[in-house]
Structures are given as structure tokens and as C-alpha cells.
Amino acid sequence: MILHAQAKHGKPGLPWLVFLHGFSGDCHEWQEVGEAFADYSRLYVDLPGHGGSATISVDGFDDVTDLLCKTLVSYNILNFWLVGYSLGGRVAMMAACQELAGLCGVVVEGGHPGLQNAEQRAERQRSDRQWAQRFRTEPLTAVFADWYQQPVFTSLNDDQRRELVALRSNNNGTTLAAMLEATSLAVQPDLRANLSARTFAFYYLCGERDSKFRALAAELAAECHVIPRAGHNAHRENPAGVIASLAQILRF
């Protein structure tokens, strides 16, 4: 079994750019950014429970990494960058810490490196279970209306919230809930030490209005790019800023 993905081919000899979306997104999420890099072959992946991979279920990050690796093999991708937002960034960091063959580097936008104590994990598990129950039982428009009121999304205006609620409500609530629980921050290990000891290039993107993840970025041994005029979802709020940072990263 492999994950559903959309492949766009560029010039031979360059590494692939493998894009991983955030929770409740899909393979279209990164395409505005990715299509600015037409020289590179691009793979836009649907993570389990989402888009064309909605029927694929996993028990945890190990399953996601295994599926991602099998997907890369199926496309004969031998050299690649992982580019991930939020959940996709966490998947990218988890996979990269497994020393993937052919990995050139990782670019994470607003991805959490992991909670650092049992109390934080227990609180996050309670919260994610409550959200999962709502995704399973309530209309998605109502759930996402509340989801986008969370503090991390304070930079969004009312029109942006309404647009995201309408877009994300096309998902399957049951499969979203399953993925939320399987890849909860509560079950993700703290990756700070692994990332510090890494052998791959590591870059971190965060919006200038995303104070939480700017603080987290400062804890990581990564080159940080602050995206102007953007909050947590920087590639949506300022795609040109993210394109500029990614172009700078890929020039090295």
C-alpha cells in the first residue's frame, strides 16, 4: 500500500521536492508554492485519512513513515527534500530522524518538535481526544469554526477563517479523527536531541505573527526563516514569502 500523491516532473538530475500538508489539508495545499519550482520534480502527498488517502488508517508515526518510504520507492525517488507544514512538518521530522536514504534536507513550516514532559502530553491527549470525538460526531463546519478560533490561528481575519472552514469541511470527519489520534503530539517523542545530531540539512519556516512557533524555532538547531505578514499557515497567508525562502534554501 502507498499514499495517494500527485507527481509533477521537472529536469533530471535535481532532487525531488516532496510536500506534506497539514492536518485537514490535502495534496493541493502546497501547489501554489511548489509550482514556482518547475525545474524540480514535485510530489504532493495526501497523508493518511486525508484526500485520496482518506481510507488509509495508521496506528502511529512509524506506520506513516513506512507508507511515505514505500510511496517514494514507488515513484523511484532516490534524492529528495521533505517540505512539511504543521502535521506534515512533524511527519517530515519523524521520518528524517530515521536516517532515510536519499534525504537531502528537511524544510519545516510551523511543525512542533515534541512535548517535553508527561504533564504536557497528558493534557494534549485529553484535548486531541475531545477534538477527535467532535470530528466523529458533529458537522464539520461547526467543528472547524471552533478549530480556527484556537490561539495559534489568531492572525487570521474573519474572511480567512470562513474560507478555511468551508475548505476543510469537505473532509471525512471519521478519518480525520483517526489520524488526529494516531499522530497526536501526545504520542510524538521529543525530537530536539535527534534533530541536533542530524546529518541532513534542516530549515525552519514560521510566520512573523506566529509567536508560539517562533519561540519553538529558537530551541532548534535549524536555520530559521521568518515569513513576513504571516501567521501559523505562512505558505497560505504569504506564498511569495515562502517561495522566496525556499528558493534561497535550495540555492545552497
UniProtKB/Swiss-Prot annotation:
Matching Pfam families: Abhydrolase_6
Annotated pathway: Quinol/quinone metabolism; 1,4-dihydroxy-2-naphthoate biosynthesis; 1,4-dihydroxy-2-naphthoate from chorismate: step 3/7; Quinol/quinone metabolism; menaquinone biosynthesis
Lineage: superkingdom: Bacteria
Catalytic reactions on record: 5-enolpyruvoyl-6-hydroxy-2-succinyl-cyclohex-3-ene-1-carboxylate = (1R,6R)-6-hydroxy-2-succinyl-cyclohexa-2,4-diene-1-carboxylate + pyruvate
Enzyme Commission number(s) from the entry: 4.2.99.20
InterPro entries: AB_hydrolase_1, AB_hydrolase_fold, SHCHC_synthase_MenH
Example GO molecular function: 2-succinyl-6-hydroxy-2,4-cyclohexadiene-1-carboxylate synthase activity
Swiss-Prot/TrEMBL keywords: Lyase, Menaquinone biosynthesis
Gene Ontology biological process terms, A to Z: menaquinone biosynthetic process
Family, similarity comment: Belongs to the AB hydrolase superfamily. MenH family.
Record text on subunit structure and interactions: Monomer.
Function: Catalyzes a proton abstraction reaction that results in 2,5-elimination of pyruvate from 2-succinyl-5-enolpyruvyl-6-hydroxy-3-cyclohexene-1-carboxylate (SEPHCHC) and the formation of 2-succinyl-6-hydroxy-2,4-cyclohexadiene-1-carboxylate (SHCHC).
Protein name per UniProt: 2-succinyl-6-hydroxy-2,4-cyclohexadiene-1-carboxylate synthase
Organism: Escherichia coli O17:K52:H18 (strain UMN026 / ExPEC)
GN (gene name): menH
